[in-house]
Amino acid sequence: HLSYKEIREKYIKFFEQNNHKEINSAPLVPENDPSVLFVNAGMFPLVPFLQGETHPNGTRLVNSQRCVRTIDIDGVGDAYHCTTFEMLGNWSLNDYFKKEAIELTLKFFVEELGFDINRIYATVFKGDDTSPKDTESIDIWINLFKEYGIDAKVGEKILEKGKDDNWWELATGGPCGPDSEIFYEVDGQLVEIGNNVFMEYLKVGNEYRPL
């Protein structure tokens, strides 16, 4: 078994080897932002750069962000929820997109951590009246599983979900888009182990505009 420190070190090193620069964890209590009590996701302190600001460390970043999620408090004590945790994240600022993002994530889990590819599942956005199905991610997953000798089918290894499960956006609007989550089968239950968010839209009011 790996400790959380060993997993963090492997993650940072893996993405540094793929031309990412490590950035520090932002303060747990947000500076100049009253919208949340604590930073609750690795993406939170990077939103200005996802909106177009230039990051001093470049366009490929990796970090381990300290987080607290008050909405998870009732779940603390089971095998999947913690009071506080570190969220590992790799970030592409107008650099690579879906194909390389999903490839890197899967490669880290399978080749660096030794996860069994046969126990890995993916979810993708199924589309709705305001945003189309993420067919690109579906095709990427089918081809990646095929490289490992798996004939992945939608509805089996690749599951389609709605906005409640496979969409990221801020309540205040701004950049948003579909995501593709990765799950690992543990004792017959699928446990989320990773997520790639794709900022393809700008939400203005109730309208989603392609970026």
Language model regions located:
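Structured aminoacyl-transfer and RNA-binding surfaces used for tRNA recognition/handling
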Residues: 1-211
